[in-house]
Amino acid sequence: MAKSYPLVAAACAAALAASRAASADTAAETGDSPALQEVVVTANRREESVLTVPYNISAISAQQIEEAGLKDLQSLTRMVPGLVSADLGPRVNSTNSNLIIRGLNASDQGSNYFGPNLAVPLVSTYIDDVPLFVNYNLTDIERVEVLRGPQGTLYGSGAVGGTVKLIRHKPDLGLFSVDVTSDVSGTDHSSGASYSFEGIINIPLGETVALRANAGYSEQKGFINGLHAAEFDKNGQPVLADPTNPLTSDYLYHQINDVDGSNNKYGRLSLLWKPGNSFSLLVDYTHERDHSGGFSWQDVAFNYQTGATRDRPLYTTTQRIPQQPLDRTLDIGAITASVDVGFATLTSSSSYYDNRYNDVIDLSSTEQYYITRNPYYYGGYPRYAAFNFDYSTDKSLVEELRLVSKAGRPWDYIAGAFYQDRRSLLSDPETLPGFAAWSHLPGSANNYNYYAGTAFNT
């Protein structure tokens, strides 16, 4: 049903007109006219005005990031037209790129849900010159550039839909500065407050060298409650509801609140050496650790035999293992050297990253499906609470060499070479706690044998 608010619209129009009139009067009195700040981007691997870039591009400055309260790549969708993402919570967002530009993505959102997806996405992400997807904190970021449409020429594979570039602040040779920020927030249906804090320091070390460092910590409280969590002892074995009946007893269950909470620790060191206008060397190291709990989902009670569903309280899950932790450790090292050769700028960018994951995924619903259809699946084991122990590594060595012409020349050009050696591994063994011990429990059997015989000898 459409609604109109003519009085509000008229008031807004009047206020806007008054504001414009006041601005015009002020400009006439002072003789000053408002000036628009030029936006400089590096989409073409050179610094140039965003107005001269022949691409559909959006650039978001550090001030805009701060004013809008943007925290990570998922939140960029609030400011960038055409950039879409399915926010599946920190458990999924930290491992997989759900970014979509112009409707292009490597696969549907659901297929990326449970664990790391090592396939190359159709929207590439760069941290400075490092081609890597992580849901990076938008802290100490100078600018975010979003390029729409195919960018394979300059940004290689994974850029069919577009490219998202995070350009971080570099050390400042002429300024000593310290910046400390913190914030506290609340989430509906959560039992606690979320918070974060960060410190940034820039230290000139003489006239040609500067060091920049930042570190921070954030904690996001969950809002999903696990109503039916199975208990395990310190050895990972089931705690029985009836210890006197190990053959048929179910788990002992309890409730866990806010299972989908997460925290993030990160730090970065950056050293710049610039002995003159014709040469610069930047050395950068980043370390980051994430911990995420369960999934931010509301499950539906489902009967596998009849297909019927039952209502359950909102913001709850009945998974037997609702706490499905994911731990991620990221290390990025990069060395960038640039030299002015007169007619162009020659740049060498060398980088290495090591992205590691460990996580647990509850498969109890899958086992329930088979056990419901066949009571003797797993030999009739009564305590089905299976899960995967996932382990994933993603390592890459990248070298890029490029020659970029000077701006303002009649003929602009860029030439370069790119090499990447990427190695990925994913292992996901499944375990069923307590099954081995249960299948070797002592049992008893009664055997009866009756026989009789006769013989006739002659």
Region roles according to the model:
Residues 223-258, 293-321, 362-389, 429-458:
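Solvent-exposed loop segments that connect transmembrane elements
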Residues 34-173:
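Acidic, small-polar-rich N-terminal luminal/periplasmic segments of exported/outer-membrane proteins
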Residues 1-31:
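Cleavable N-terminal targeting peptides that direct proteins into the secretory/outer-membrane pathway or into
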